[in-house]
């Protein structure tokens, strides 16, 4: 993922609402969201090159999502894919507080990342860019891109404010959330972060919905957990031109699985 906004225990009827975009190289093979053949409890898209995923949930209510931390100067080659961290959490049974030690994962073996985890009771956030950045989250509206949680990049602020409007409604509207994820406006130069990439790329990456030669937003996903135990998972995929290709919707029944 490259942009995630989420409301955690803010809406009285929907304890977790997630709206996110996945940005990736356009030639990287990807499978759309579905239940996995090898792990049928996992519902997620899949990176067919490395085998992991950027975001997903399970039929038991676990959720995880990941963004890369953008710092070209520290990127190492030949290290494990960060997408396997999401898969590991979804397959694990430990709490957000105990992961990843419970799975015997060395977080320093990966390039920089941010990881969000929800175990059904608590929402966790961690980043391997600084070992002190690891905590359970309080209720609130959050935004995450390719820096730390709630870093006030323009598109992060925009996504949070757009999500806040949905949270104030009686029922969040999936189409409206997919709509604000489609915002392709570029931030003005004075508001751009400096992440070590050329200015032309920094500009392109400042949009919520990215279109750049060879790279761009591949999918938008909205996940809504209801207090009634029902979760809706909606994914919209895009072609290389940015046009919508398909929208897939799943409803997961968590009754008797977790207590939200």
Predicted regions mapped to residue ranges:
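N-terminal nucleophile
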Residues: 1-260
């Amino acid at each position: 993922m490259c942009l995630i906004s989420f409301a955690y225990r803010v809406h009285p009827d929907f304890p977790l609402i997630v709206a996110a975009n996945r940005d990736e190289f356009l030639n990287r093979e990807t499978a759309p969201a579905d239940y996995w053949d090898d792990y049928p409890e996992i519902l997620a898209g899949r990176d067919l090159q490395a085998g992991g995923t950027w975001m997903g949930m399970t039929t038991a209510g676990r959720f995880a999502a990941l963004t890369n931390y953008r710092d070209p100067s520290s990127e190492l080659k030949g290290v494990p894919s960060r997408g396997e961290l999401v898969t590991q959490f979804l397959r694990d049974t430990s709490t957000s507080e105990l992961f990843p030690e419970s799975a015997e994962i060395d977080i320093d073996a990966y390039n920089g990342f941010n990881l969000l985890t929800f175990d059904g009771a608590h929402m966790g956030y961690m980043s391997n860019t600084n070992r002190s950045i690891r905590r359970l989250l309080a209720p609130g509206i959050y935004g995450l891109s390719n820096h730390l949680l709630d870093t006030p990049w323009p598109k992060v602020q925009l996504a949070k404010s757009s999500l806040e409007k949905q949270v104030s409604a009686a029922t969040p509207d999936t189409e409206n959330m997919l709509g604000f994820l489609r915002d392709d406006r570029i931030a003005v130069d004075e508001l751009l972060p400096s992440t070590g990439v050329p200015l032309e790329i920094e500009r392109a990456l400042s949009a919520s919905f990215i279109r750049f030669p060879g790279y761009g937003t591949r999918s938008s996903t909205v996940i809504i957990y209801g207090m009634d135990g029902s979760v809706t998972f909606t994914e919209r995929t895009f072609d290389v031109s940015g046009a919508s290709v398909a929208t897939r919707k799943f409803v997961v029944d968590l009754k008797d699985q977790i207590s939200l």
